[in-house]
C-alpha cells in the first residue's frame, strides 16, 4: 500500500513510531507517518531527530514547493489528504489511510513532484529552510509545518495545543504528538500544499497561507484539538505567510555571472554581442571587428578566423541576457545611441529605429521601471452565480502601478489586507495571464515580465483566487474573504466538534464512529460555519466513513463553502445550509449544480469524499491501481486522484488540483451519491466507472469541457457527465443510486450542460480522453460521436448537417457555375462543412457536438466515419460534379471551362458564355463565344471551352485563383487556406485505400485539378517560355492591358479566342491567344483539346460520374486547368493530370498544343506585356483621338482579328491586333526577337531595339504556328481581308460583335477623352494602341492596335490638335491624298512602299504622339516623339503642320513608298519566317489599317510629314526624303536587329527593316533622341514591339494587296 516514497520514508516513520509509540494506533503512525512522513519525512523524522530539520521540512511542507517537500509533500500531501484530521484521522483511517496513502501518495507524488519541480522547489526550500530555522525546533516542527515559519512564541503555543490535543487524543509523547500534529498539520498544510503543489507557485503563498492555513488547517484539526492552537496558529500563520511570502531563493550575485557577460577585449559588458561560430566565444561587435582587422585569431583562443569570410554571427539571445542581467545597461546604451545619432542627422536618417536608440521592442526592463497591472478575482463565474452586493466590488479588476521589483508576495499581501482575508484560514494564489499559471511568491514583476514576455502593450493581467487552505480534503473553490470573527468562531466550533469527534474517533477508530460523528458533525455544522462542516467531512472521511448522506451534505456544504467562501456571508450560509445534513443537500445541491457548471467551464477538479471504509474497500482494489495509473497518466490531476482515491485521495485532490485545473473550482463531490447516503459498496460499483471518471476528471483538470455523451452504461454516461463535477463524483463514488441522484443534480445543476454541453464537452473530452483514457471512453466515444459529431460540426452545420450535405451537393454545382456563386457555396460547404461531418455523424450515427470536437472525432473515427465523411463532401459535390460532367460532359472543353470558371460552366454549361462574360466583361464574353463558335469548330468546342475557357481564362487568370480558392474552400468548407488545394480536404475525409468502398478515385482528381489550377498561373511559361510573366499577368489581371489587360473590351474580343492566355488580361490576353491561332490552341488548350479532348472529357465525365467525385469545384478547376493551363502547363500539367489515373484531365490535347501554344502564348504574352506597359500611354492619348475614326479602326481591327480567329487561327488574327504587330516584327526581326524574349525587362534602349525583336520573334513563332491556322485563313480568307478592310466585320462579325462593346468604349474613349483613355488601357486595345502609337501607321493596320492606332492618330490629332488641330486638319487632306495614293500603291505590287510611307505617315502620327508623349507617356508614338527629341514638336508640329503642305506630305509619302519598296521586299523576305498566311493576313491587316490611317491618320500623316520636314530642317535631318534615305540603309543593314534599334524608338514595327522612308526618318530622329525616348519608350517600346510587328507586317499586307 505504501508508495516507494512512503516505504523509503518508513525508516523515518520508524523513528516517528518510536517517538510516537504512545500513539494509539501504530498503524496510524505508520500510515500517517509514512504518508505524512513523506510530508513530514524530514519534518516528522527530523522532529524526533533534528528540530532544525523539522523547521526546514516544515518549511518544505508549508512551502509546498520545496524540493524536500517534493518527496515529502508528494507523499505527505497524498497522505495528508487521507490523514487530514490529524489524530482522529489517524485512528480512524489507519488502514484506509495506508491504502489511500499509497494511492494518494502515488498520484500526489506524481502531481506534487511535477508541480514542485515546476515550482523551483529547491530554491524555495533553501529560503524557507532559513526561515524555518528561525522557528523553535521541536515545537517549531509541528507548528512550522503548519505555519511555515511561525515565531517561536506562536510555535510554542501551537506546540502546546498540539501536545495537549495529542495527550487528549492518545497519550503520546509530546514529541510524537508534535510529530502527529505536525504531520497532521503538515499533512493538512501539505495537503493544502499538495493542492498548492498542484499549483506549485500559488502553493508557496498557499502553502504559506496553507501553512498559515496549514496552521489553520492543522489548527482546525488542531483547533479541533485546541482552540488556543488555532488562535496561535492563525496569528503565526499570518506572520508565517509574510515570512513565506518574503522567502525566496538565494539571489545570485551579478559578480558570479560577470565573467560570462563581459567582452574580453574591452572588459565591459557585451554590446551587440557577436559570437565566433567555431569557438563560440562572444565579444562586442565593434571590438571583434577591430580585432579581426589586426589579427586572424580568436581573442580568447587560437581558433583561426577567415578574414575574408569571418564566421561570426550576431548573438541576440546573449545580448538580451546581458541587458536583462545588468540593471540600467540597456537604458544607458540607448542613451549612447541617441547621443551618437543626434550629432549625425545624415546617418540617423539611414539608421533603423533600433540603431538610433529607439526602444521598439520594450522587452528590456529596469528595476526602476514602473509596471502597470490589473488584479482581478479569478473565479468571477462563481461569484456571479451566488454573488452578493458586497462581492460586486470584487468583480472589477484593480489597476495598480508598481515598481518592477514588486513581488508576488506583495500582491498577495495587498489582497489579504484589501479584503481583510484571514491568512490563517485562506490562501491566495496569484496567477498571470491564465488562471493556471500560479506565480511564486518571490517572483518580481520584472521576473514575470521576462518569463511571460510582457511587451508593455497593456497592463499585466493578474488574477487571484482565495481558497480555504486548512481543508486538506476539499480544495475550496476560491474562497472569498471571511471576517476574522466568523473564521475564529467557526474554528472554535470546529475545534469543539473536533474534540467531540476525536473522542468518538478514539472510541471507534474505524467506521463505527461514522454515525456518531456524522450526527455530531451534523449538529456542529448546523450550529457552526461551513468550515466546520468541511472539518467534519474531513473527520468523517478520515476518521470513519460517515453516512453517505452526511458526506453528501458535507461535500455540498463544501461546495457551497467554496462558492460562498468567497464571502463570509456565503460561508455562513453554507454553514447554515450544511447544518441540516439531509436538508443541506437540497439547498447545497443548487450550489453544487452551479459549482459543477463552473467546474465544467473551469475544469473543476472533483475531489471524491468517501468514507475511509470505502477508501479501504474501493481504493485498494481498483481505485489504487487506477488512481495510480491515472495519476501517472494525468500527472497529478486532482480529478483523477480524487476519483481514484475516493475519500482520502479526494481530500488530497481537493487541495492538489493540478496547476492546470482551477483549484478553487475543485469540488470534491466525492461519493456524494445522493442527498441520502448510498451504500459504501457504491464505490466498488463505481470503480468500473471509476476508471473512466478519473479520466474525465483528469481531463476536467485540464480545463477540458468534460461533457460526455451518455451512451454506453449509465455509469459511463455519468462519467461522461463527469463534465458536471457532481455527477462524476457521484459516478465515481456512488453506485447507480448515486448516479440517479447525480443525474438529478447534474441535470438540475446544469441540464443544458449535462445534455447538450455534454455532447460538446464530451466530444472534446473524447478527443483528448481517448488518447489518455481507457478503452472504455473510446467505447463511449464511438457512440458519443453521434452527439459529439453534431457538436463537432461547425456550429453552422451542427443542425443542418444532414440537409447541409444535400444542399451542398446541389449548390456546389451552381458555385462552380459562377465564381460569385462559388463563394457563397463555398461558404455553404464551409458552413456546411457539415457535409463531410454529416456523413460522419450520419454514418457513424454520431451527433456533431462541438466544431472543435468534431475534428478530433473525425480523426479518431476516420476508420469509422471515413466512408460517410469523405463521400459526403464528394457526395455533396459529386452531384455538382456530375452536373458539371453532364453539362460540360458533352464537351470536354465545357468541363474544363466550367471547372475553370469555378463550376460556372459545370452548373450552367450553356451559361458558360454568361459566366465567361461575367468573369471578364459581359460583352466580350458573348462575342468571344460567338466568334469562337462561329469562327471555328474549335470555336464551338472552344465556344464551350473558350466560353468556359475564355471566361475561364479570364477567370482562370483573374477568377482562376479565385476559383481555385473557391473550389478548395468548397471541398474544405473554408478549411483550406486560399492557396491550399482540395487535397487539404482530407482532414474531414480520411484517405481510403483504393480497395475501400469509400475510396474516391475522382477525389484525387480534384486534388490534381486543384494543383493544375495552381500551375495555371504558371501557364505563362507554358504559353511561351518568354511569356511566363505575361501569362501570370494575364492570369492575375490582364496580361495585356497593364494587367487590367483591358477591362476585357479588347481582350475579350480576342480573349474569347484568346481566353487561354489570360482572358482576364482583356485585350492583352486576347492578343496573346490571337497571337497564334494557337492563341486559342495554346492558351485555350481547348483548341486542340476541343476535338479529341471532348472524347477524353466525356471520359472524364464518366470518371466523375462513376467516381461520384465530390470535388465539383476542384474538378472543374482541374479541367479548366487543362484548358486554361493547356497553353503553358500542357506539358507539365498534362503529365500531372495523366499521372493520376483519375485525371480525366488527361483530356489532353495539351501536349499537342504546347509547341504552338507555347510560342503563341509567348507571343501573346509578349505582345500582352508590351501593351500592358503601354496601356497607360494609350489611355492618355486615347482621349484626344477622334472617336469616329478611332471607333472604325478598332472595329475593323476587331473584325480583322475576329476573321483570323474565325479561321482555325481565328486567334492569331485577333492576336494580330497585338499579335499581328508582333508577326511583322517577327518576320523582319524574328532573329533579333528570338534574342530579346526579355523585352519587358530590357532597358529602354534595349526594349526599343529588342522589344520589337521579341515581338517579331513571337510573331515569327506565331506566324510559324498560327499562319496555317489563322494567318492563312485570315489573309487568304475573304473574311480576313474583309476584316482587314475596315468593314471586314463580316467574318469578324463575332469578333466585331466582341469588339463592338470594345469599340463603343473606344468611341467613348476618344469622346470621353480623359475618361476613356483609362478605359482604353483596360480595353486591351490600349496595349495594342501603344504598339500602334509606336508604329503610328502599322498600329492602325493592326486589328487591335489599329483601333488603338486610329485612336492614337485621332488622339494625337486631339492632343496635338488641341493645340494645332486646325493645322492638322488642314494637313489631313494632303495626308489623305497621300494615303489614297498609298492605297493605290498598295493595290499595286508596289503598295508595300506606299504602305510604308503610310507607315511613315503613321510615324508622324506617332511622333505627334511623342509630342503628346508627356501626356500619354511612353506610348510608342510618344517613344518616337521622344526619340525624335521632338517633345517640343507639339509646338513645332502646330506651326509645321500649318506650314507643311499636302505636297510635302505627298513627297514624303512618295519617298517613303519608294524607299519602302525595297524595304517591303526585304520585309517580305523576312516575312518568309512568317507563314504566307501571316503575310496575307498582315497585308490585309495593313490594308485595313492603312485605310484607317488614311481616314483617321491623314491629318496625322500630314502633320507627321510636316513634322519630318521640320525635324529635317531643325534637326539637320534634311528633307524627309533625306531622312528616309539614311534610314533605308540602316533598315537594310540590320534588317532584323540593327534597324529595330534605330526604328524601335519610334517604329519598333518597322525596325525589322520594313521601316518605310517616312517611318525611317522619324526613326532616325528618334534614334537621335532614342536615349531619352527609350527610357520613356521602354514601356512604349513594349507597346512598340507590339506595334512594330504591324509595321513590319505592313509590307506583307501591302504586298498581298
From Swiss-Prot:
PROSITE patterns in UniProt? ZF_RING_1 (PS00518), ZF_RING_2 (PS50089)
UniProt keyword list: Developmental protein, DNA-binding, Metal-binding, Nucleus, Phosphoprotein, Zinc, Zinc-finger
Biased segments, Low complexity type: 8-91, 182-198, 228-245, 567-590, 638-649, 729-739, 1011-1022, 1069-1085
**Cellular component per GO, a single term:** PRC1 complex
Q: Which Pfam families match?
A: RAWUL (PF16207), zf-C3HC4 (PF00097)
What GO molecular-function term can you cite, just one?
promoter-specific chromatin binding
Ranges annotated as biased composition (Polar residues): 199-215, 676-689, 929-938, 1116-1133, 1261-1272, 1352-1375, 1561-1587
Q: Where is this region: Disordered?
A: 1-91, 165-245, 561-693, 711-856, 895-960, 1011-1097, 1116-1315, 1330-1408, 1512-1601
Task: Give me the stretches of Gly residues compositional bias.
Answer: 1036-1045
GO process annotations (BP): anterior/posterior axis specification; chromatin remodeling; heterochromatin formation; negative regulation of gene expression; negative regulation of transcription by RNA polymerase II; regulation of transcription by RNA polymerase II; syncytial blastoderm mitotic cell cycle; ventral cord development
Query: Where, subcellularly, is it found?
Result: Nucleus
Q: What ranges of residues constitute the RING-type zinc fingers?
A: 263-302
Instruction: Please list the residue ranges that the record marks as compositionally biased, kind Pro residues.
Output: 812-822, 1204-1217
Q: Which residues carry this modification: Phosphothreonine?
A: 1222, 1236, 1251
Q: Where is the composition biased (Basic and acidic residues)?
A: 611-637, 1247-1258
Q: Which residues carry this modification: Phosphoserine?
A: 656, 658, 1139, 1253, 1266, 1274
Q: How does it assemble?
A: Component of PRC1 complex, which contains many PcG proteins like Pc, ph, Scm, Psc, Sce and also chromatin-remodeling proteins such as histone deacetylases. This complex is distinct from the Esc/E(z) complex, at least composed of esc, E(z), Su(z)12, HDAC1/Rpd3 and Caf1-55. The 2 complexes however cooperate and interact together during the first 3 hours of development to establish PcG silencing.
Stated role? Polycomb group (PcG) protein. PcG proteins act by forming multiprotein complexes, which are required to maintain the transcriptionally repressive state of homeotic genes throughout development. PcG proteins are not required to initiate repression, but to maintain it during later stages of development. Component of the PcG multiprotein PRC1 complex, a complex that acts via chromatin remodeling and modification of histones; it mediates monoubiquitination of histone H2A 'Lys-118', rendering chromatin heritably changed in its expressibility.
- Which protein are we looking at? Polycomb group protein Psc
Recorded name of the encoding gene: Psc
Amino acid at each position: 500500500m505504501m508508495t516507494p516514497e512512503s516505504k523509503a520514508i518508513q525508516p523515518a516513520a520508524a523513528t516517528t513510531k518510536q517517538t510516537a509509540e504512545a500513539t494509539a494506533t501504530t498503524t496510524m503512525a505508520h500510515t500517517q507517518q509514512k504518508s505524512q512522513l513523506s510530508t513530514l519525512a524530514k519534518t516528522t523524522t527530523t522532529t524526533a531527530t533534528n528540530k532544525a530539520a523539522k523547521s526546514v521540512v516544515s518549511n518544505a511542507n508549508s512551502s509546498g514547493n520545496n524540493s524536500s517537500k517534493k518527496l515529502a509533500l508528494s507523499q505527505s500531501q497524498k497522505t495528508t489528504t487521507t490523514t487530514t484530521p490529524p489524530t482522529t484521522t489517524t485512528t480512524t483511517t489507519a488502514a484506509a489511510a495506508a491504502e489511500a496513502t499509497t494511492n494518494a501518495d502515488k498520484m500526489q507524488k506524481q502531481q506534487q513532484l511535477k508541480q514542485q519541480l515546476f515550482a523551483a522547489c529547491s530554491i524555495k526550500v533553501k529560503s524557507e529552510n532559513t526561515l524555518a530555522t528561525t522557528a523553535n525546533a521541536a515545537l517549531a516542527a509541528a507548528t512550522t509545518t503548519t505555519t511555515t515559519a511561525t515565531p517561536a512564541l506562536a510555535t510554542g503555543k501551537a506546540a502546546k495545543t498540539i501536545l495537549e490535543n495529542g495527550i487528549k487524543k492518545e497519550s503520546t509523547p509530546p514529541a510524537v504528538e508534535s510529530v502527529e500534529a505536525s504531520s497532521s498539520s503538515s499533512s493538512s498544510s501539505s495537503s493544502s500544499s499538495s493542492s498548492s503543489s498542484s499549483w506549485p507557485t500559488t502553493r508557496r503563498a498557499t502553502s504559506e497561507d496553507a501553512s498559515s492555513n496549514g496552521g489553520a488547517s492543522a489548527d482546525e484539526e488542531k483547533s479541533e484539538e485546541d482552540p488556543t492552537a488555532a488562535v496561535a496558529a492563525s496569528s503565526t500563520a499570518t506572520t508565517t505567510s509574510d515570512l513565506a511570502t518574503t522567502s525566496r531563493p538565494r539571489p545570485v550575485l551579478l559578480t558570479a555571472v560577470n565573467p560570462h557577460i563581459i567582452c574580453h577585449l574591452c572588459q565591459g559588458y557585451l554590446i551587440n554581442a557577436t559570437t565566433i561560430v567555431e569557438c563560440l566565444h562572444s565579444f562586442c561587435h565593434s571590438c571583434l571587428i577591430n580585432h579581426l582587422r589586426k589579427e586572424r585569431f580568436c581573442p580568447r583562443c587560437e581558433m583561426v578566423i577567415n578574414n575574408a569570410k569571418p564566421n561570426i554571427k550576431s548573438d541576440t539571445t546573449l545580448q538580451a541576457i546581458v541587458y536583462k542581467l545588468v540593471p540600467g545597461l540597456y537604458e544607458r546604451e540607448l542613451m549612447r545611441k541617441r547621443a551618437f545619432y543626434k550629432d549625425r542627422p545624415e546617418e540617423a536618417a539611414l539608421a533603423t529605429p533600433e540603431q538610433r536608440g529607439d526602444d521598439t521592442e520594450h522587452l528590456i526592463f529596469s528595476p526602476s521601471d514602473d509596471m502597470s497591472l490589473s488584479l482581478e478575482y479569478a473565479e468571477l463565474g462563481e461569484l456571479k452565480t451566488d454573488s452578493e452586493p458586497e462581492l460586486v466590488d470584487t468583480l472589477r479588476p484593480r489597476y495598480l502601478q508598481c515598481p518592477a521589483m514588486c513581488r508576488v508576495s506583495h500582491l498577495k499581501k495587498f489582497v489579504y489586507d484589501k479584503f481583510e482575508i484571514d491568512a490563517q484560514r485562506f490562501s491566495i494564489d496569484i496567477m498571470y495571464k491564465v488562471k493556471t499559471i500560479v506565480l511564486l511568491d518571490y517572483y518580481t514583476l520584472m521576473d514575470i515580465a521576462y518569463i511571460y514576455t510582457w511587451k508593455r502593450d497593456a497592463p499585466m493581467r493578474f488574477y487571484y483566487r482565495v481558497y480555504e487552505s486548512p481543508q486538506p480534503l476539499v480544495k475550496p473553490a476560491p474562497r472569498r474573504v471571511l471576517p476574522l470573527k466568523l473564521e475564529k468562531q467557526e474554528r472554535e466550533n470546529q475545534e469543539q466538534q473536533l474534540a467531540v469527534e476525536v473522542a468518538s474517533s478514539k472510541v471507534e477508530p474505524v467506521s463505527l464512529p461514522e454515525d456518531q460523528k456524522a450526527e455530531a458533525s451534523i449538529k456542529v455544522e448546523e450550529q457552526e460555519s461551513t468550515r466546520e462542516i468541511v472539518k467534519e467531512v474531513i473527520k468523517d472521511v478520515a476518521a470513519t466513513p460517515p453516512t453517505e448522506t452526511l458526506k453528501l451534505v458535507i461535500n455540498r456544504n463544501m461546495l457551497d463553502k467554496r462558492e460562498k467562501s468567497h464571502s463570509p456571508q456565503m460561508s455562513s450560509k453554507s454553514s447554515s445550509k450544511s447544518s441540516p445534513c439531509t436538508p443541506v443537500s437540497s439547498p447545497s445541491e443548487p450550489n453544487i449544480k452551479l459549482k459543477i457548471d463552473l467546474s465544467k467551464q473551469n475544469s473543476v477538479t472533483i475531489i471524491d469524499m468517501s468514507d475511509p471504509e470505502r477508501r479501504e474497500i474501493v481504493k485498494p482494489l481498483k481505485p489504487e491501481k487506477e488512481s495510480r495509473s491515472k495519476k501517472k497518466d494525468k500527472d497529478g490531476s486532482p480529478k483523477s486522484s480524487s476519483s481514484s482515491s475516493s475519500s482520502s485521495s479526494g481530500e488530497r485532490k481537493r487541495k492538489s488540483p493540478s496547476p492546470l485545473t482551477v483549484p478553487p473550482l475543485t469540488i470534491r463531490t466525492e461519493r456524494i451519491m445522493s442527498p441520502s447516503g448510498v451504500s459504501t459498496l457504491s464505490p466498488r460499483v463505481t470503480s468500473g466507472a471509476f476508471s473512466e471518471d478519473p479520466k474525465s476528471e483528469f481531463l476536467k483538470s485540464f480545463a477540458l469541457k468534460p461533457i460526455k455523451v451518455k451512451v454506453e452504461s449509465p455509469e459511463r454516461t455519468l462519467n461522461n457527465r463527469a463534465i458536471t463535477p457532481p455527477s462524476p463524483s457521484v459516478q465515481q463514488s456512488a453506485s447507480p443510486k448515486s448516479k440517479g441522484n447525480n443525474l438529478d443534480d447534474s441535470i438540475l445543476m446544469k441540464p443544458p450542460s449535462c445534455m447538450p454541453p455534454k455532447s460538446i464537452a464530451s466530444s472534446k473530452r473524447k478527443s483528448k480522453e481517448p488518447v489518455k483514457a481507457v478503452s472504455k471512453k473510446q467505447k463511449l466515444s464511438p457512440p458519443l460521436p453521434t452527439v459529439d459529431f453534431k457538436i463537432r460540426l461547425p456550429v453552422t452545420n451542427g443542425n443542418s448537417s444532414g440537409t447541409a450535405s444535400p444542399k451542398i451537393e446541389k449548390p456546389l454545382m451552381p458555385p462552380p457555375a459562377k465564381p460569385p456563386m462559388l463563394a457563397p457555396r463555398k461558404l455553404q460547404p464551409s458552413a456546411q462543412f457539415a457535409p463531410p461531418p454529416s456523413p460522419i455523424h450520419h454514418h457513424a450515427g454520431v451527433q456533431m457536438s462541438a466544431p472543435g470536437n468534431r475534428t478530433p472525432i473525425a480523426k479518431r473515427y476516420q476508420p469509422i466515419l471515413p466512408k460517410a465523411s469523405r463521400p459526403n463532401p464528394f457526395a455533396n459535390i459529386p452531384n455538382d460534379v456530375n452536373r458539371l460532367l453532364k453539362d460540360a460532359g458533352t464537351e470536354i472543353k465545357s468541363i474544363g471551362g466550367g471547372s475553370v470558371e469555378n463550376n460556372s460552366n459545370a452548373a450552367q454549361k450553356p451559361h458558360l458564355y454568361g459566366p465567361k462574360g461575367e468573369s471578364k466583361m459581359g460583352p466580350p464574353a458573348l462575342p468571344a463565344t460567338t466568334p469562337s463558335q462561329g469562327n471555328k469548330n474549335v470555336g464551338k468546342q472552344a465556344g464551350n471551352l473558350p466560353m468556359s475557357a475564355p471566361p475561364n481564362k479570364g477567370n482562370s487568370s483573374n477568377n482562376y485563383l479565385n476559383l481555385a480558392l473557391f473550389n478548395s474552400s468548397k471541398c474544405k468548407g473554408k478549411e483550406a487556406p486560399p492557396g491550399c488545394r482540395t487535397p487539404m480536404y482530407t482532414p474531414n475525409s480520411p484517405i481510403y485505400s483504393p480497395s475501400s468502398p469509400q475510396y474516391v478515385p475522382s477525389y484525387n482528381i480534384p486534388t490534381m485539378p486543384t494543383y493544375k489550377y495552381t500551375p495555371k498561373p504558371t501557364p505563362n511559361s507554358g504559353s511561351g517560355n518568354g511569356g511566363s510573366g505575361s501569362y501570370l499577368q494575364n492570369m492575375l489581371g490582364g496580361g495585356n492591358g497593364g494587367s487590367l489587360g483591358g477591362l476585357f473590351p479588347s481582350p475579350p474580343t480576342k480573349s474569347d479566342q484568346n481566353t487561354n492566355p489570360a482572358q482576364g488580361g482583356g485585350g492583352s490576353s486576347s492578343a496573346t491567344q490571337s497571337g497564334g491561332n494557337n492563341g486559342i490552341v495554346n492558351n485555350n488548350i481547348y483548341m486542340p483539346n476541343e476535338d479529341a479532348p471532348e472524347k477524353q472529357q466525356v471520359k472524364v465525365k464518366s470518371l466523375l460520374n462513376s467516381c461520384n467525385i465530390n470535388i465539383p469545384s476542384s474538378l472543374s478547376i482541374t479541367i479548366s486547368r487543362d484548358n486554361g493551363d493547356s497553353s503553358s502547363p500542357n506539358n507539365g500539367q498534362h503529365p500531372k493530370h495523366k499521372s493520376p489515373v483519375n485525371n480525366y484531365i488527361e483530356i489532353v490535347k495539351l501536349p499537342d498544343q504546347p509547341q504552338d501554344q507555347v510560342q503563341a502564348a509567348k507571343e501573346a504574352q509578349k505582345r500582352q506585356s508590351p501593351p500592358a506597359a503601354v496601356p497607360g500611354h494609350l489611355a492618355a492619348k486615347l482621349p484626344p483621338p477622334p472617336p469616329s475614326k478611332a471607333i472604325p479602326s478598332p472595329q475593323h481591327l476587331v473584325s480583322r482579328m475576329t476573321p483570323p480567329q474565325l479561321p482555325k487561327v481565328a486567334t492569331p488574327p485577333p492576336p494580330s491586333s497585338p499579335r499581328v504587330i508582333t508577326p511583322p516584327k517577327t518576320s523582319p526581326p524574328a532573329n533579333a526577337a528570338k534574342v530579346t524574349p526579355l523585352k519587358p525587362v530590357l532597358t529602354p534602349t534595349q526594349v526599343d531595339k529588342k522589344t520589337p525583336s521579341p515581338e517579331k520573334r513571337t510573331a515569327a513563332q506565331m506566324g510559324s504556328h498560327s499562319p496555317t491556322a489563322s494567318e492563312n485563313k485570315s489573309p487568304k480568307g475573304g473574311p480576313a481581308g474583309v476584316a482587314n478592310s475596315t468593314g471586314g466585320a463580316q467574318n469578324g462579325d463575332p469578333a466585331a460583335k466582341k469588339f463592338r462593346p470594345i469599340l463603343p468604349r473606344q468611341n467613348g474613349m476618344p469622346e470621353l477623352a480623359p475618361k476613356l483613355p483609362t478605359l482604353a488601357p483596360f480595353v486591351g486595345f490600349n496595349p495594342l494602341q501603344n504598339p500602334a502609337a509606336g508604329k503610328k501607321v502599322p498600329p492602325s493596320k493592326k486589328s487591335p492596335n489599329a483601333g488603338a492606332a486610329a485612336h492614337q492618330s485621332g488622339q494625337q490629332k486631339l492632343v496635338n490638335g488641341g493645340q494645332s488641330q486646325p493645322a492638322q486638319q488642314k494637313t489631313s487632306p494632303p495626308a489623305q491624298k497621300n494615303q489614297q495614293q498609298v492605297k493605290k500603291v498598295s493595290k499595286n505590287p508596289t503598295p508595300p512602299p506606299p504602305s510604308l510611307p503610310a507607315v511613315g505617315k503613321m510615324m508622324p502620327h506617332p511622333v505627334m504622339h511623342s509630342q503628346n508623349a508627356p501626356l500619354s507617356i511612353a506610348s510608342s508614338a510618344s517613344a518616337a516623339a521622344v526619340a525624335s527629341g521632338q517633345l517640343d514638336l507639339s509646338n513645332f508640329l502646330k506651326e509645321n503642320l500649318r506650314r507643311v503642305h499636302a505636297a510635302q506630305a505627298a513627297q514624303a509619302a512618295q519617298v517613303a513608298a519608294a524607299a519602302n519598296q525595297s524595304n517591303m521586299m526585304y520585309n517580305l523576305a523576312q516575312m518568309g519566317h512568317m507563314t504566307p498566311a501571316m503575310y496575307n493576313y498582315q497585308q490585309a491587316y495593313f490594308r485595313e489599317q492603312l485605310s484607317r490611317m488614311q481616314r483617321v491618320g491623314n491629318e496625322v500623316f500630314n502633320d507627321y510629314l510636316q513634322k519630318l520636314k521640320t525635324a529635317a530642317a531643325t534637326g539637320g535631318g534634311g528633307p524627309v526624303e533625306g531622312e528616309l534615305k539614311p534610314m533605308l540603309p540602316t533598315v537594310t543593314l540590320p534588317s532584323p536587329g540593327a534597324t529595330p534599334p534605330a526604328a524601335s524608338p519610334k517604329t519598333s514595327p518597322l525596325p525589322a527593316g520594313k521601316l518605310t522612308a517616312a517611318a525611317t526618318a522619324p526613326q532616325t530622329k528618334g534614334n537621335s533622341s532614342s536615349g531619352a525616348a527609350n527610357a520613356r519608350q521602354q514601356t512604349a517600346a513594349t507597346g512598340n514591339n507590339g506595334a512594330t510587328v504591324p509595321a513590319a507586317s505592313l509590307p506583307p499586307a501591302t504586298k498581298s494587296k
